[in-house]
């Protein structure tokens, strides 16, 4: 689907997808490739179901394992030709985020991949994730934010405590970079779809990171569905998360 990125053909809009967003040709093309590969797995006798942001739920003979597919996380970037978008795959053995036992986030532009298996750690490019040490303990080096304009205003206390901010426009890639320590903190101060986070939250957990909503509640028990939404505050370790949560708490 890369040849479609940033083109008029790739921006052609279709009906609203299962996730509630308008499906574009770049989404359809990427999903077709993924579903074709999963159908080939089913033909070899594997039983599972697939839940895609574009086409919804499809059964291949069993409710679980359930494969979550976001074929293009960062669709607007892809439409505009901004090379920051990725493929998110998560495999669950139950209905909640905590039930994610395998996850993959692929940067479709660079080919860089983050993977995680429950209780087996997280990897970036095949190597176990090693978080970059933080030098300045007084401020966050880089704060990552969700991309809606209101997020900047709502996260202002965190912004004022940070040296730099980054807004990638891809939830999966943002959390993946947090898991590997690129972001000291990532914040989505407005409710975002839990479905988009499933693979990245496993990466974060397996790498030793922490994720909660802005009130400090774990997001793991939430249903990993297309209609479940939550705020999000995550960091690559408990110390940074506690610091960020304290700052957000002062705002309330």
Q: What is each PLM-predicted segment?
A:
Residues 1-72:
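N-terminal subdomain of lithium-sensitive/metallo-dependent phosphomonoesterases centered on the IMPase/IPPase/PAP
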Residues 27, 75, 116, 178, ...:
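Residue-level signal for inorganic ion chemistry
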Residues 51-54, 69, 106, 145, ...:
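Short His-Asn-centered micro-motif
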Residues 61-119:
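DPxDG-like acidic metal-binding loop motif
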Residues 41-42, 120, 131-252:
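An extended, acidic
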Residues 34, 38, 87, 91, ...:
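Buried hydrophobic packing segments
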Residues 21-29, 79-81, 169, 194, ...:
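Short, conserved micro-motifs enriched in small and acidic residues
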């Amino acid at each position: 689907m890369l040849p479609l990125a940033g083109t008029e053909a790739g921006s052609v809009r279709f009906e609203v997808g299962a996730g509630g967003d308008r499906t574009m040709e770049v989404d359809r093309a990427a999903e077709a490739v993924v579903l074709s590969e999963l159908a080939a797995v089913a033909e070899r006798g594997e039983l599972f179901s697939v839940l895609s942001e574009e086409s919804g739920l499809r059964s291949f003979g069993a409710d679980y394992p359930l494969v979550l597919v976001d074929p293009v996380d960062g669709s607007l970037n892809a439409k505009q030709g901004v090379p920051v978008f990725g493929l998110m795959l998560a495999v669950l053995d139950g209905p909640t985020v905590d039930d994610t036992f395998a996850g993959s986030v692929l940067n479709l532009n660079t080919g860089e991949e983050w993977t995680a298996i429950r209780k087996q750690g997280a990897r970036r490019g095949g190597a176990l994730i090693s978080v970059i040490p933080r030098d300045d303990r007084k401020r966050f080096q880089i704060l990552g934010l969700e991309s809606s304009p209101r997020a900047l205003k709502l996260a202002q206390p965190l912004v004022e405590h940070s040296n730099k901010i980054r807004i990638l426009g891809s939830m999966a890639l943002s959390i993946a970079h947090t898991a590997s320590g690129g972001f000291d903190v990532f914040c989505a101060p407005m409710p975002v779809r839990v479905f988009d986070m499933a693979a990245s939250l496993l990466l974060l957990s397996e790498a030793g990171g922490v994720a909660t909503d802005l009130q400090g509640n774990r997001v793991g028990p939430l249903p990993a569905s297309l209609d479940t939404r939550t705020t999000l505050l995550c960091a690559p370790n408990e110390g940074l998360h506690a610091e960020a949560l304290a700052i957000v708490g002062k705002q309330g």
